[in-house]
């Protein structure tokens, strides 16, 4: 049996694949542990959802594509992170490292290379992120969720594996979903997700359109931390900052979703055949990865996209109406998608490629 180190963090998307793979590893008798940041969302998710997995916090700095005084400070944080990670890896002596990306992963990958620990990295977005571009220099292989991502990567290192979906995602219970929300099973449900950090602009657009939206939908609104508006008390509208294990039950009653365009989330909607209206993060807040993801999904007929700078009350209602009119054809397109690798297949491939 092998011992496997996992890393990745900063957003839910940089943790979700690990959350799927770690139980697969331990169920097969392998040992696993996690290296992440001290205060990132990965720590909360791993410690709450996988309490038996040892979590090692390290120093980490943010990687920026623009000039900033903070870049100089963060160089030292990254170097400290390499030292922290190296100490953990020397003590735990894993056989391999699996990295999901995010800024915290870079010092861990560098530390693993310094100890000759083979590393496999995973890229969920259509275009590779900065952390994975750096990590690739020190890794043995990189796996991609989108097949089109291969054109950005060296052929000898890159493999397309598709999306790896949590098994419990498909085990949501409609009865529990309706019980949680108090909704009527005879009326459609719209789920609004602004990403792990929430979206003030998306929240505002939903609330400004609430009266019109509630004519056609009951609404589950995942607002993001600290963004619930307690002054709103409308029948058929519920708000949560963030949900964990309840999400599968809420998705089980969802007819349409309005969401950011992080790849893990949108592949989950695709797997569940939920038509989607995607509002990707703009270039003022990101490198444009969500824009690429959203455009790719729209081109395949899985839903519609509104660029955030074009999000208006009128546009939101228009696009949702289009989705309702085209619901059958959207779901038909979604049904042509087939999962490439199960989590068991992916785990076996990791072992084969790394060891």
Swiss-Prot record:
Please state the pathway this protein functions in, per its UniProt record: Cell wall biogenesis; peptidoglycan biosynthesis
How far does the signal peptide extend, from start to end residue? Answer: none
Q: Mostly located where? A: membrane
Q: Has UniProt tagged this entry with the keyword Metal-binding?
A: no
**Annotated GO MF terms:** undecaprenyldiphospho-muramoylpentapeptide beta-N-acetylglucosaminyltransferase activity
Question: What GO terms describe the biological role, i.e. biological process, of this protein?
Answer: carbohydrate metabolic process; cell division; cell wall organization; lipid glycosylation; peptidoglycan biosynthetic process; regulation of cell shape
- Stored NCBIfam families: PRK12446.1
Q: Which family does it belong to?
A: Belongs to the glycosyltransferase 28 family. MurG subfamily.
Fetch the PANTHER family from UniProt: UDP-N-ACETYLGLUCOSAMINE--N-ACETYLMURAMYL-(PENTAPEPTIDE) PYROPHOSPHORYL-UNDECAPRENOL N-ACETYLGLUCOSAMINE TRANSFERASE, UDP-N-ACETYLGLUCOSAMINE--N-ACETYLMURAMYL-(PENTAPEPTIDE) PYROPHOSPHORYL-UNDECAPRENOL N-ACETYLGLUCOSAMINE TRANSFERASE 1
Q: What is this protein called?
A: UDP-N-acetylglucosamine--N-acetylmuramyl-(pentapeptide) pyrophosphoryl-undecaprenol N-acetylglucosamine transferase
* Species, as recorded: Staphylococcus haemolyticus (strain JCSC1435)
């Amino acid at each position: 049996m092998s011992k496997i180190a996992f890393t990745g963090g900063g957003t839910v998307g940089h943790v979700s694949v690990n959350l799927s793979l770690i139980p697969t590893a331990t169920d097969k008798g392998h040992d696993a542990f996690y290296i992440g940041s001290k205060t990132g969302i990965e720590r909360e998710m791993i410690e709450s959802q996988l309490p038996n997995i040892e979590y090692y916090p390290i120093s980490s700095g943010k990687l920026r594509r623009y000039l900033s005084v903070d870049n100089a400070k963060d160089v030292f944080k990254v170097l400290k992170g390499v030292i922290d990670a190296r100490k953990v890896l020397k003590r735990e002596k894993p056989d391999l490292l699996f990295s999901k990306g995010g800024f915290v992963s870079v010092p861990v990958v560098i530390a693993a290379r310094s100890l000759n620990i083979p590393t496999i990295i995973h890229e969920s977005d259509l275009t590779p992120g900065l952390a994975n571009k750096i990590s690739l220099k020190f890794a043995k292989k990189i796996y991609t969720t989108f097949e089109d991502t291969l054109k950005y990567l060296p052929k000898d290192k890159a493999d397309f594996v598709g999306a790896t979906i949590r098994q419990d995602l498909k085990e949501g219970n409609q009865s529990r979903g309706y019980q949680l929300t108090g909704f009527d099973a005879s009326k459609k449900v719209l789920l609004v997700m602004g990403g792990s950090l929430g979206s003030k602009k998306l929240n505002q657009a939903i609330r400004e359109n609430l009266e019109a939206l509630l004519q056609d939908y009951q609404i589950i609104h995942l607002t993001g931390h600290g963004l619930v508006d307690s002054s709103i008390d409308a029948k058929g509208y519920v708000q949560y900052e963030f949900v964990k294990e309840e999400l599968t039950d809420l998705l089980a009653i969802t007819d349409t979703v309005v969401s950011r365009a992080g790849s893990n989330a949108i592949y989950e909607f695709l797997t569940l055949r939920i038509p989607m209206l995607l509002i990707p993060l703009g270039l003022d807040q990101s490198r444009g990865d969500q824009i690429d993801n959203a455009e790719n999904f729209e081109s395949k007929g899985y839903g519609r996209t509104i660029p955030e700078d074009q999000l208006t009350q009128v546009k939101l209602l228009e696009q949702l109406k289009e989705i309702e009119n085209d619901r059958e054809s959207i779901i038909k397109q979604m049904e042509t998608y087939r999962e490439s690798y199960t989590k068991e297949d992916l785990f076996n491939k990791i072992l084969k490629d790394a060891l």
